[in-house]
């Protein structure tokens, strides 16, 4: 999240909203805020990556491909439910024979649990953080001291010792990278591109759809003019992008979501939420309750809370699923992604229906 001209009136001295009311008011501004935050970086990275396009394929070559014979797939994202529900164990126990699509942030979880995903998806253009999911060859204590992003997250306990975890990821991906296809966004940082090439992952390039390409000054149109690659509506986040790869690119008919929480478990300190520092910058610590929304999930009988970014991702996903020809099953068993067009069932129920 980043303050834009449209929301500058909100600051730590005059916030009157409570109980997440401000988050709902910000929904209409989130697309512009995202463009302000990442737009220049997306274009800079895409221009630099022109020199690497010949190291991979266009995403169009993956379209309607069957990575596995089955017409169903499981998406594994890295929401806080991942370490609680452990979908990899269920996949292996049930000898699931469908396609496994993992966000880059869930890739190390998969490999650590003996599961090699068929396709990995990456989107975020951040210069230094995203490469951590691939193993950062340059990570040291100085880098860790400069950015506590990973240390603050409610994530896989394996990341508690960050240096050791990084070395483990380096080793695992060096071993398994050549077996994995990756849908690599042109917005990706040079650190990620270098690491992907080093590991031998098979690259399929794509452009994220960042705005309406028919509008004047469209970033999406600039990307497409620059490289001619397919554009995919990623919904603002890698979890939704992974679902779109299953739906619009691979043409799957049944898609299970795991680790797609778009939220946090009750009791999680605000400090451990992904956009905590951005929230502090926007409204100040005393007004954080104005930005965090509570949801009761009727399918699991528990409540969860979310921030403006993940609230936006949720609303965008619910719009996108209406246009999908696939049947989407949320098997996260928690979180806030539920509504029309999504069947909320346990992951075991999905595996019983579509397992090996």
Where are the regions that the model predicts?
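Beta-sheet-dominated scaffold domains
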Residues: 194-196, 238-242, 279-281
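General structural concept
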Residues: 98-104
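ATP/pyrophosphate-binding catalytic subdomain of soluble kinases
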Residues: 219-260, 264
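Glycine-rich phosphate/pyrophosphate-binding loops
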Residues: 106-107, 113-127, 249-271
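Contiguous, well-ordered alpha-helical segments that form the cores/surfaces of helical PPI scaffolds
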Residues: 104-112, 240-245
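Active-site phosphate/oxyanion-binding loops
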Residues: 263, 267-301
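N-terminal donor/sugar-recognition subdomains of glycan-related enzymes
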Residues: 1-97, 108-121, 128-205, 229, ...
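Active-site gating loop/helix substructures
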Residues: 200-234, 285-302
């Amino acid at each position: 999240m980043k303050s834009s001209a449209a929301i500058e009136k909100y600051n730590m001295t005059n916030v009157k909203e409570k109980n997440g009311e401000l988050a709902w008011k910000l929904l209409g501004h989130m697309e512009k805020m995202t463009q302000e935050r990442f737009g220049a970086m997306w274009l800079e990275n895409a221009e630099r990556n022109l020199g690497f396009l010949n190291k991979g394929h266009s995403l169009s070559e993956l379209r309607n491909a069957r990575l596995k014979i089955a017409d169903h797939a499981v998406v594994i994202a890295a929401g806080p439910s991942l370490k609680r529900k452990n979908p990899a164990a269920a996949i292996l126990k049930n000898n699931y024979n469908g396609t496994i699509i993992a966000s880059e942030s869930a890739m190390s979880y998969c490999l650590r649990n003996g599961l090699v995903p068929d396709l990995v998806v990456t989107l975020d253009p951040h210069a230094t953080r995203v490469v951590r999911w691939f193993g950062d060859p340059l990570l040291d204590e100085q880098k860790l001291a400069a950015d506590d992003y990973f240390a603050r997250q409610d994530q896989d306990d394996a990341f508690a010792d960050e240096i050791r975890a990084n070395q483990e990821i380096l080793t695992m991906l060096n071993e398994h990278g050549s077996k994995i296809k990756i849908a690599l966004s042109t917005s990706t940082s040079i650190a990620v591109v270098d690491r992907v090439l080093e590991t031998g992952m098979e690259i399929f390039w794509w452009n994220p759809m960042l705005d309406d390409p028919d509008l004047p000054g469209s970033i999406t149109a600039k990307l497409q003019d620059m490289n001619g690659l397919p554009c995919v509506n990623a919904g603002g986040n890698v979890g939704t992008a992974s679902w779109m790869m299953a739906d619009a690119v691979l043409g799957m008919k049944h898609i299970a979501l795991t680790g797609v929480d778009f939220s946090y478990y009750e009791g999680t300190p605000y400090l451990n939420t992904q956009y905590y520092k951005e929230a502090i910058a926007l409204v100040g610590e005393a007004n954080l309750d104005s930005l965090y929304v509570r949801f009761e999930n009727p399918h699991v009988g528990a409540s969860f809370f979310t921030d403006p970014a993940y609230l936006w991702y949720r609303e965008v996903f619910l719009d996108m699923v209406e246009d999908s020809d696939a049947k989407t099953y949320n098997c996260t068993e928690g979180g806030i992604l539920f509504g029309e067009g999504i069947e909320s069932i346990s992951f075991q129920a999905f595996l019983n229906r579509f397992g090996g």
